[in-house]
Design a protein with these regions (language model features):
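N-terminal chloroplast transit peptides
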Residues: 1-30
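N-terminal mitochondrial targeting presequences
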Residues: 36-49
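RNA-binding accessory domains that recognize and position tRNA/RNA substrates
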Residues: 49-50, 88
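Short, basic/aromatic recognition patches
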Residues: 55-79
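Short beta-strand scaffold segments in enzyme catalytic cores
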Residues: 81-91
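Zn2+-dependent cytidine deaminase-like catalytic core
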Residues: 89-191
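Phosphate/diphosphate-binding glycine-rich loops and adjacent basic-rich segments that engage nucleotide
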Residues: 196-205
Length: 205
């Protein structure tokens, strides 16, 4: 499945137009309904590496597909207490080879479903995930480790997960394994999908 060139004609998010001066892990806040949540990202200063942290038009198109998948279970409470998450695996030849979404609490997250569909084609591919991959053992194993074990080369994350059990840990694990990570692709839309989740986690945290 290949995206047409027309789907790449999307504008780059304004907050990614800024050019930082060095590699750094930062936090920023986003206000909603009187509450704030923290999102962790990594920015790279002016160099050949800088473009790697900026979502491309193709990245945005694939992320929008992942967002659409995340809405499959239904309304905001359909996966309660978990967030709604979608994942798309794209091969080096720009083909979608796996897709998945989290259907409900207690079942696998989006990433394992997408990786299962991709099989061996996941090796060297890019994973588009609407929310930072989890990094802890709960009802399921860490999705960050599943991506590593599958041989994923690059991960594009829609928005960080403010859950104290994750909160940057998934991104850190992926980077430690040598995987390129881009954070903040279609961030606003990814936030809106799980607005209730973000508010609840922030309030309880």
């Amino acid at each position: 499945m290949r995206l047409e060139a027309a789907s790449r004609a999307l504008a780059r998010p304004a907050h990614y137009l800024r050019t930082p001066t060095l590699i750094q892990q930062i936090s920023w806040t986003k206000k909603t309904l009187g509450h704030r949540h923290r999102v962790v990202a990594v920015r790279v200063g002016p160099s050949d590496e800088a473009e790697k942290t900026v979502p491309s038009d193709a990245d945005r198109a694939y992320m929008n597909r992942a967002i659409d998948l995340s809405l499959t279970p239904g309304g905001p409470m359909s996966t309660y207490p978990n967030p709604r998450v979608g994942c798309v695996i794209v091969s080096a030849s720009d083909e979608i080879v796996g897709e998945g979404y989290h259907p409900r609490a207690g079942l696998p997250h989006a990433e394992p479903y997408a990786l299962r569909g991709a099989g061996q084609l996941a090796r060297g591919a890019t994973a588009y995930v609407t929310l930072e991959p989890c990094d802890h053992y709960g009802r399921t194993a860490p999705c960050s480790q599943a991506l590593i074990d599958a041989g994923i080369r690059r991960v594009v994350v829609g928005i960080g997960d403010p859950n104290p059990l994750v909160d940057g840990g998934g991104i850190a694990r992926l980077r430690k394994a040598g995987i390129e990570v881009v954070v903040g692709c279609e961030e606003d839309r990814c936030f809106d999908v799980n607005k209730e989740f973000f508010e609840r986690i922030t309030k309880n945290g």
